Amino acid sequence: GDRFIPNYNKERTNNSSLTIISSYGITDHFTISAFFPFRYILNQKVLFRGQNPNLYNGGKYFRESYGLGDVLLQARIQRTFFNEIPIVLGIGVKLSNGKINMTDEFGERISDNLQVGTGTVDPILSIYSSQDIKKLVLSGGVFTRISTGENIYGYKYGNEIQTLINLDYIENHLLYGGVQVSHLLSTRDYYEYGKISRDRGGESYFLTGKIGTKATDNLDFEMTLQMPLHQNLNESQLVSPFIIQFGSLYRFGT
């Protein structure tokens, strides 16, 4: 739903990631990219007496996973329509290399949503376009991941589709910035080969601000702050009040 409810167990999840992106332009209109996400996930909560047989008297309970997540490979082709509107079409695949067998301190496998990998190979599709408006750039895109089936533990992640609109100012050589409005829609997950997983799926709207600097002609640094505008999620789910991201981009010469 879209209402806040008490978090009696004081549960929280810290999800940190470092993504290395490598792109190579085969031609001016055809590019291949690889995304390598290194992830660290820490979930912690306070259990009441009897909630967990391994910690019967209650207390703090931690679950964590870390390592290289699922690698994404993508090919993008750019075409111009109506003599001036560039359209970038992307097609790729999410690999299943990330670990999905991390355990807690008692040797019990932690839930699929806390693993760094998914255990399935899924296609990813995207379409993106941009248009210069004086000193601004207006852009937008749609990105989707289609779940193809269950992993070896019988868990199937829901499909995801994300729509976003950006307005960026890039005229200044040293500083640039922009805002983004995005919508994320996720369908339900399934476990044990077909059972509906509660507390998963729903839709969210976000507002994101961005600021960056061009340190050199080849090197950029960037920071983004994302805040939820509205969230309508299935059952009860943990939500984040904001997300901060730091990034850098280096352009290699040819």
Write out the residue ranges for each language-model feature.
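Residues on the lipid-exposed face of transmembrane beta-strands in outer-membrane beta-barrel proteins
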Residues: 20-24, 34, 73-77, 91-93, ...
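Detector for outer-membrane/organellar transmembrane beta-barrel domains
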Residues: 112-193
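Transmembrane beta-strands of outer-membrane beta-barrel proteins
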Residues: 32-34, 73, 85-91, 123, ...
